[in-house]
């Protein structure tokens, strides 16, 4: 059955799924052979779903990335990590629930896992602050990463946040400073760091745990300097232009792969990760093990040098003179 709540462009799929369920119910309640009709409808639903999700606009991908049933950091950890033990606190009196972390095993290797954590419903989202971490969350994350560095544990981070919390108290506690320290100190880590955007990666809140040797993204995740709504409000003073901003910001995996920002875009199951979370978990685990195996062949200095070079190469631009200007010159 479809996962609820449903997105606007998924409604044609809902009608097909309802028809499929009605036929299944008919088969259970009677001896009528409906195998052929069921196969035809399931095949049609699969084709429709694939067609819809292959043609998603950037604005629609944002809706998928924000889907409340999309697998979260803890969901993925539970899928493929054995013996996970959560670690708490920034040692300054805070234990932010919007950014969680701990140690566990990926296969036969001990690793540190940390990431943003959203809730499934209003109550959970309030407790998790909708995945928007405070300064205490980023300081906790850095404390755990330093712990991993000390014990030579590879670091796996999972990004899923609209941005760092921008409330008055967060600013008073040094939100900008906390993120800046993370950016600085992550470049000095001597262990492999792999970051994965599993939902939405927004602004400095994403970068605070995103300085990595490899940056992965799911197919329908987004990674952006600012939310399209905020961008539209700033540029056009009209949040209704968010779809235009989403297209201009180049927030999709395909765009960011072409720009050299991300290293790999992970395919999602037909309909997105919320339709088949276990399949998404298998895809992510395979990618993490593959990239981790490659990074573990590098020395500590090679890791740091490559990480520095990777980020220094970002943001370069090319100028192309128009023919008209060239003629004038």
Curated annotation (Swiss-Prot):
InterPro entries assigned: Acetyl_CoA_COase_a_su, ClpP/crotonase-like_dom_sf, COA_CT_C
Pfam family, one: ACCA
Highest rank taxon of the organism: Bacteria
Residues of the CoA carboxyltransferase C-terminal domain: 40-294
Keyword Transferase: yes
Keywords (A to Z) from UniProt: ATP-binding, Cytoplasm, Fatty acid biosynthesis, Fatty acid metabolism, Lipid biosynthesis, Lipid metabolism, Nucleotide-binding, Transferase
Pathway in which the depicted protein is active: Lipid metabolism; malonyl-CoA biosynthesis; malonyl-CoA from acetyl-CoA: step 1/1
GO molecular function, one term: carboxyl- or carbamoyltransferase activity
Catalytic activity from the UniProt record: N(6)-carboxybiotinyl-L-lysyl-[protein] + acetyl-CoA = N(6)-biotinyl-L-lysyl-[protein] + malonyl-CoA
BP terms from Gene Ontology: fatty acid biosynthetic process; malonyl-CoA biosynthetic process
GO annotation, cellular component aspect: acetyl-CoA carboxylase complex
Gene3D superfamilies assigned to the protein according to its UniProt record, in alphabetical order: 2-enoyl-CoA Hydratase, Chain A, domain 1
Keyword ATP-binding part of the UniProt annotation: yes
Localization in the cell: Cytoplasm
Enzyme Commission code: 2.1.3.15
Disulfides per UniProt: none
Subunit note: Acetyl-CoA carboxylase is a heterohexamer composed of biotin carboxyl carrier protein (AccB), biotin carboxylase (AccC) and two subunits each of ACCase subunit alpha (AccA) and ACCase subunit beta (AccD).
Protein purpose: Component of the acetyl coenzyme A carboxylase (ACC) complex. First, biotin carboxylase catalyzes the carboxylation of biotin on its carrier protein (BCCP) and then the CO(2) group is transferred by the carboxyltransferase to acetyl-CoA to form malonyl-CoA.
Similarity comment text for this entry: Belongs to the AccA family.
NCBIfam families found in the cross-reference section: accA, AccA_sub, PRK05724.1
Name of protein: Acetyl-coenzyme A carboxylase carboxyl transferase subunit alpha
Native organism: Synechococcus sp. (strain CC9902)
Upper taxonomic lineage: Bacteria, Bacillati, Cyanobacteriota, Cyanophyceae, Synechococcales
Gene that specifies this protein: accA
């Amino acid at each position: 059955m479809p996962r609820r709540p449903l997105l606007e462009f998924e409604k044609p799929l809902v009608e097909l799924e309802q028809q499929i369920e009605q036929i299944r119910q008919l088969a259970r309640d009677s001896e009528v052979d409906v195998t052929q009709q069921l196969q035809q409808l399931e095949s049609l639903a699969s084709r429709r779903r694939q067609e819809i999700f292959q043609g998603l606009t950037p604005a629609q991908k944002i809706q998928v990335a924000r889907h409340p049933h999309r697998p979260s950091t803890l969901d993925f950890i539970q899928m493929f990590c054995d013996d996970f033990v959560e670690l708490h606190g920034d040692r300054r009196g805070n234990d932010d629930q919007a950014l969680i972390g701990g140690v566990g095993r990926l296969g036969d290797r001990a690793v540190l896992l940390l990431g943003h954590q959203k809730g499934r419903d209003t109550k959970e989202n309030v407790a998790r602050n909708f995945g928007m971490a405070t300064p205490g969350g980023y300081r906790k994350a850095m404390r755990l990463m330093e712990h991993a560095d000390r014990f030579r544990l590879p670091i796996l981070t999972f990004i899923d946040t609209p941005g760092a919390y921008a409330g008055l108290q967060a600013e008073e506690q040094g939100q900008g400073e906390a993120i800046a320290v993370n950016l600085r100190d992550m470049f000095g880590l001597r262990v492999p760091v792999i970051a994965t955007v599993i939902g939405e990666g927004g602004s400095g809140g994403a970068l605070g745990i995103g300085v990595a040797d490899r940056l992965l993204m799911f197919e329908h995740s987004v990674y952006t300097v600012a939310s399209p709504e905020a961008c539209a409000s700033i540029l056009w003073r009209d949040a209704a232009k968010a779809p235009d901003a989403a297209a201009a910001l180049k927030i999709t995996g395909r765009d960011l792969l072409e720009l050299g920002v991300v290293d790999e875009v992970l395919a999602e199951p037909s309909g997105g990760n919320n339709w088949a979370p276990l399949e998404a978990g298998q895809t992510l685990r395979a990618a993490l093990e593959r990239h981790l195996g490659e990074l573990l062949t590098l020395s500590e200095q090679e890791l740091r040098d490559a990480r520095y070079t990777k980020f220094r190469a970002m943001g370069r631009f090319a100028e192309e003179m128009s023919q008209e200007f060239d003629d004038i010159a």
